[in-house]
C-alpha cells in the first residue's frame, strides 16, 4: 500500500477509492487486521500515484489538505476538483449507511474502538490475556470511501474492506419451521413427517431452548426426558433432508467478558460438542435475564455474540472437513432492531454474520408493515438475510392476515414462520383450513421456483455487497417516487414485490 506520513498523521492509500487517515498513538501506527476492518491484507499490493506539496496531497481528481497542526486530524479536508467534499470530524463507528438517494461523495468510517484480532480467531489458546485480542479505545483512525454519490459503489467498497456476509447454504433459502415449543424426539419427528404428507418442502427446523436440561435456558446438557437420544434424532432429521438449528440463550461464565480465556474455552467446547453429534446451526438469542459481556462499550454483546458463534462454528467445520468445509450458518438479532422496532445498525461488523432476525414481533397488520420496512432498511445496510418471525411471534392472525404474512415471508430473504407456545394456531401452512393451506403452498412453490434467482443474487451479494432484496431507491436513486417507497422492494433487478399491508389496498 502507498502511504505518506505527515507528523503524527499517516495517509494510507488502500486504493484510489479507499483512503485511511490515521493519527498515531504513542508514536505507533496500526497495520494489523482489526475487528471492524478485517481485510487490510487484500490491499497490500495496491499502488496509487500522488504528488505532495507543503499544504497537501493531490491524486487523480482529489486533493487532501493537511491540517495546520501535524499532531491532530482536526482541520484535515478533502477537495474534489477544487470543491470541499469532506472535513474531518470525530465520529463513532456505525453500520448505518446513508440511504441510496442520499449517498455522499465521501463516506467516513471510524475504526474505534480498534480491536486487533489474534491470528487464530475466536479459539481457546491457553491463559493468554484477553485471549490475544488487543483493544484500543478512542483512537482516531478513519477510512474514507470516495464513492462519488454512487450507492452501489459505496456498498462494494464497504464490504470489501469490512468483510462480506458469508454465502449461506442453499438450504437456508428454502422452507423453515420455527417455534418456541417444547418438542420431544417423537413430536419433532412427527412434524417432519407431517410436512412430507402435506407435500410441503422443509429444509430447516428450529428446536428452541427446551432442547437443554436446565430450566433457565442455560447450559449445554441435552434434556434426555424430551430427547432420549439426540444423536439419533439428528440422524433421523438428516435422513429426511432436514437441517436442525438449536436456540441458545447464553449466560456469561462467572461474569467474564467474551474475550476472557475461561469464557472462550467454555463457549467453544460446548458449542462444538453439539456440532460434533450432528447439529447443523446455532441460533444465538438474547437471554431473558442476562447476556454475554462485551469488553468495550463500543461494541454490543449482540455483535460479539454473532462473531463468536460464527467463528466457533467455522473453526469446527474447517477442522472436520478440511479445505472444502461446510459453510457456517448462524442466526442472531439484528443490531439494532428490537422486537420489530428499527433503531439503527450500530456497528460495521454485524453485517458479516449470515441470518439475522428482527426479534419477537406481533402478528398484527402494523407489525407486518414494519417488517417490510425493516427488510428494506436492513438490506440497504448490507444485511442480506434479514428475516421476521413470519406470522408473528405472538398472537393469532386471522386467515387473510396469516396468508399476507406467508406471502411476504416467501418473498423475503429467509422464509421462517415462527410463533410462541401460547398461540391458538401454529404457523404451519395447514394450521387454518384447506383453502388457506392451498394458497400458502402456491407461494411456497413460487419461492422454490425463484430459488435460482435468489441464490444468484445471494452470490452477487457475497461478491459486491449488493442486496438480494433491495429498495426501489437502490436501482432508481434519482426517482423520488422510487426512493421514498417503504412498502415495495425488488428481487434482483427485475422482479417488483408489492406486499399488501398497512393502508395499501388491492
Language model regions located:
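A low-complexity, Ser/Thr/Gly/Pro-enriched, surface-exposed linker/loop concept
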Residues: 12-54
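Extracellular/luminal recognition modules and glycoprotein regions
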Residues: 1-8, 14-16, 26, 31-33, ...
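Catalytic-domain carbohydrate-binding cleft regions of carbohydrate-active enzymes
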Residues: 64, 75-506
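Generic recognition of long tandem-repeat/solenoid scaffolds
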Residues: 2-6, 21, 52-60, 78
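Secondary-structure transition/turn motif
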Residues: 22-28, 58-68, 81-82, 119-122
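Hydrophobic residues embedded in beta-strands of well-ordered beta-sheets
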Residues: 18-19, 55-57, 113-115, 496
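Short, well-ordered beta-strand segments enriched in hydrophobic/aromatic residues
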Residues: 11, 19-21, 61-64, 496-499
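A short, compositionally biased
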Residues: 1, 14-16, 51-55, 68-75, ...
Amino acid at each position: 500500500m502507498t502511504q505518506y506520513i505527515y507528523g503524527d498523521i499517516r495517509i494510507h492509500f488502500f486504493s484510489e477509492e479507499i483512503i485511511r487517515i490515521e493519527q498515531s498513538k504513542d508514536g505507533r501506527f496500526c497495520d494489523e487486521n482489526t475487528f471492524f476492518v478485517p481485510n487490510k491484507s487484500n490491499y497490500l499490493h495496491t499502488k496509487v500515484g500522488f504528488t505532495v506539496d507543503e499544504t497537501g496531497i493531490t491524486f487523480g481528481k482529489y486533493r487532501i489538505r493537511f491540517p495546520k497542526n501535524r499532531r491532530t486530524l482536526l482541520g484535515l479536508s478533502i477537495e474534489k476538483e477544487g470543491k470541499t467534499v469532506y472535513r474531518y470530524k470525530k465520529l463513532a463507528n456505525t453500520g448505518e449507511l446513508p440511504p441510496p438517494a442520499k449517498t455522499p461523495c465521501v463516506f467516513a468510517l471510524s475504526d474505534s474502538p480498534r480491536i486487533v484480532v489474534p491470528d487464530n480467531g475466536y479459539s481457546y489458546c491457553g491463559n493468554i490475556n484477553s485471549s490475544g485480542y488487543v483493544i484500543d479505545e478512542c483512537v482516531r483512525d478513519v477510512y474514507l470511501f470516495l464513492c462519488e454519490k454512487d450507492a452501489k459503489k459505496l456498498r462494494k467498497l464497504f464490504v470489501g474492506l469490512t468483510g462480506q456476509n458469508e454465502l449461506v447454504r442453499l438450504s437456508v433459502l428454502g422452507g423453515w419451521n420455527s417455534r418456541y415449543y417444547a418438542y420431544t424426539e417423537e413430536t419433532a419427528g412427527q412434524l417432519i413427517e407431517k410436512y412430507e404428507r402435506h407435500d410441503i418442502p422443509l429444509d430447516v427446523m428450529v428446536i428452541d431452548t427446551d432442547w437443554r436440561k436446565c430450566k433457565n435456558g442455560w447450559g449445554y446438557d441435552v434434556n434426555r426426558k424430551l430427547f432420549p437420544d439426540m444423536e439419533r434424532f439428528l440422524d433421523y432429521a438428516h435422513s429426511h433432508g432436514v437441517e436442525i438449528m438449536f436456540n441458545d440463550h447464553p449466560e456469561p461464565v462467572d461474569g467474564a467478558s467474551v474475550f476472557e480465556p475461561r469464557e472462550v474455552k467454555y463457549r467453544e467446547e460446548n458449542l462444538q460438542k453439539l456440532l460434533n453429534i450432528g447439529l447443523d446451526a446455532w441460533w444465538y438469542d438474547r437471554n431473558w435475564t442476562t447476556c454475554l459481556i462485551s469488553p468495550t462499550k463500543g461494541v454490543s454483546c449482540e455483535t460479539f455474540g454473532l462473531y463468536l458463534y460464527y467463528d466457533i462454528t467455522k473453526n469446527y467445520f474447517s477442522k472436520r472437513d478440511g479445505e472444502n468445509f461446510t459453510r457456517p450458518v448462524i442466526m442472531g438479532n439484528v443490531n439494532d432492531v428490537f422486537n420489530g422496532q428499527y433503531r439503527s445498525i450500530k456497528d460495521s461488523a454485524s453485517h458479516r454474520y449470515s441470518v439475522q432476525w428482527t426479534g419477537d414481533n406481533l402478528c398484527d397488520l402494523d407489525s407486518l408493515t414494519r417488517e417490510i420496512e425493516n427488510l428494506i432498511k436492513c438490506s440497504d445496510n448490507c444485511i442480506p438475510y434479514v428475516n421476521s418471525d413470519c406470522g408473528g411471534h405472538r398472537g393469532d392472525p386471522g386467515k387473510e392476515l396469516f396468508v399476507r404474512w406467508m406471502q411476504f415471508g416467501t418473498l423475503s430473504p429467509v422464509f421462517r414462520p415462527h410463533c410462541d407456545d401460547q398461540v391458538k394456531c401454529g404457523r404451519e401452512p395447514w394450521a387454518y383450513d384447506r383453502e388457506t393451506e392451498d394458497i400458502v403452498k402456491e407461494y411456497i412453490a413460487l419461492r422454490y421456483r425463484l430459488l435460482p434467482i435468489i441464490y444468484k443474487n445471494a452470490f452477487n451479494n457475497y461478491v459486491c455487497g449488493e442486496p438480494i432484496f433491495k429498495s426501489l431507491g437502490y436501482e432508481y436513486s434519482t426517482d423520488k417516487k422510487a426512493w421514498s417507497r417503504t412498502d415495495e422492494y425488488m428481487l434482483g433487478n427485475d422482479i417488483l414485490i408489492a406486499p399488501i399491508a398497512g393502508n395499501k389496498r388491492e
